[in-house]
Amino acid sequence: MTSVITRRHFLASLPALVMAPKVMAQSGNAPIRVRALSHMTLTVSDPKRSVEFYQGLFGLPIQARQGPTSLLRIGRGPQFLALSGGGANLRPGINHFCLTVENFNVDRIVTILADHGVAKSDATGGGLSGGPMKARVRVRGAESGGAKEGTPELYVGDPDGIVVQLQDPSYCGGAGALGSVCPAPEPAPRRGLLAVRNLSHFTIGVSDPPRTIAFYQALFGLPIQAHQGASPVLGIGGGPQFLMFSGGGGGRGGANPAPPRPPRIDHVCLTMENFNPDNALKALAGYGIKPRGAATGPVGPLTSYVSMRMEDRGGAKGGTPELYFTDPDGIPIQLQDVSYCGGSGYLGNVCP
């Protein structure tokens, strides 16, 4: 995974890094205790094509449906990958991600959020959350796969407006008061070429990494479980799952520099057992996802490549291989071993 952080951001983050052991010790007393990564929703240009693509590659069954949105179960569930049509005005990408939290209660969590500067939004507009440092409750009705009386779903906008959904650990995207009632999964048409087991992490590009890290740690008490260069890796639920925040820059330099990229969820990582990058690349190539090779510039759809994370970014001495591919819309997906924690070692599974 690639992270970009300026010298100013690095210096500003030093106090947080020095306090890491204290943060780890206090994580159990966090205002909102996070259990695990739940899901992400991908905005895609052709939902039918994307369902066929992910089912053919991974063999994911349909766990639930929310109107036209299909929820594909990852591993044994309830974690999932949701695929939603974007319409003419929405670009393909990772729309939002979800964390599961202990003692999920909308009123309780909204009160805690308000104490941390996140105001409840009842106005229209501003996306799912209402905008940066806003929270919005959506009551999903039976027409969208929710309970007859409605299934509450809570969306939070972080300092950059990145949307984080918060739900109960039993949430499967289905009906019931907790969204935990899902029918028997609809099997994929055929067995996938690669078997993914779980969600690993999200890498998120933000405008001010130290500010964002402070926000997530203050709310969720996320401990630092590793470093990749100057960037800390924030553990989820005791690990190995995590979140990572990188600088939002990366525009073209020179006489006519490009503007920084807007804040975004850059990519998601899925895990598989017995991860072998060569075998995975071969399977991807057989599915029509071709190696990038020596090409430079933006990575187009249906392309794969391996990045070697070296010691200067917390990788192994000879490099930790990290495999990426893009789907039909060019959305990047990372694949790693089930033990991957963002640390060192060949599998990236050595975290202090």
Where would I find each of the regions flagged by the language model?
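Short linear motifs in intrinsically disordered
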Residues: 59-64, 100, 141-147, 220-226, ...
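Conserved short beta-strand elements that form part of the metal-binding/catalytic scaffold
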Residues: 61-94, 101-103, 163-170, 223-265, ...
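Vicinal oxygen chelate
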Residues: 2-30, 35-46, 70-71, 86-195, 281-282, 286-352, ...
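Residues that act as N-cap/strand-start positions at coil-to-secondary-structure junctions
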Residues: 36, 66, 148-150, 198, ...
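Hydrophobic, helix-prone linear segments
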Residues: 19, 28-38, 54, 70-73
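Mature N-terminal segment immediately following signal peptide/propeptide cleavage
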Residues: 33-65, 200-209, 213, 218, ...
